[in-house]
Amino acid sequence: YMIDWLTNYGNNCWMSIFYNNHDNPRMVNKITEDKQYHEAIMKLLAVMQMTLKGTPFIFQGDEMGLTNYQFTSMDQVTDVEAKGYFKEYCESMSKKDAFKKILVGTREHTRVLLPWNEKLPSYHEGLVQEIRTEITDVYKTLIKLRHEDETFVYGEFDVLNKKKDRFVYKRSLEGKEYIMDCNLGKDVQKAYQADGFECIFTTGTDKDTLSAYEARVWKKK
């Protein structure tokens, strides 16, 4: 959707770039419930959000690496819509199964208060402060990069590789060029190679391959 708009309408449209809002569960959980990938996905989403054309909106908790809230009972859910669906689901399944189904899509996940208690399961086990800091640092770095170079704001947008599990695009303005290489899947992939470019930011470590959900930013020398 976003690629089609940016490609077909160019400077005639201005997108709002966001993943989360008060009416949906956290995007990272929509992509996968496998916690081992959550940190990488959060960083990947941040890279795309801060380098695509449009105005980025950071929803509360994105910058801290929050995931869906760990509700343990339907009594904790105040969302009227969720309660209505729960009652409907209970007519054809057990309350336990109905509750599981509600948790997948309820907007309650992004309406709870920010969990200041570091022991809450919204954070990764045993790495609360480290994980939160890493995600925050990624946002700080990318926001600084965006503020320092208007290429990320007003630059042209060109898709270099658009596959189901790979997204490579370029931003260019007045001779300046940046290439973003994004692995949208779990499989390790060969890194994008561009002559005359240097990698100025990466969410991974290996030089020749992209790890699961890794993203890199290349700058023209």
Language model features with spans:
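Active-site clefts of carbohydrate-active enzymes
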Residues: 12-35
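Beta-strand-rich binding/interaction modules
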Residues: 187-203
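Residues immediately flanking
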Residues: 21, 184, 220
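Charged, E/D/K/R/S-rich low-complexity terminal regions of large eukaryotic assembly subunits
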Residues: 184-185, 194-195, 213-216
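C-terminal beta-strand-rich structural cap/linker in extracellular carbohydrate-active enzymes
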Residues: 206-221
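Short, basic/hydrophobic alpha-helical segments
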Residues: 5
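Glycine-rich, flexible loop/turn motifs
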Residues: 15, 23, 110, 153, ...
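Loop/helix patches that line or flank the sugar-binding groove of alpha-linked glycan CAZymes
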Residues: 2, 10, 33-178, 184-189
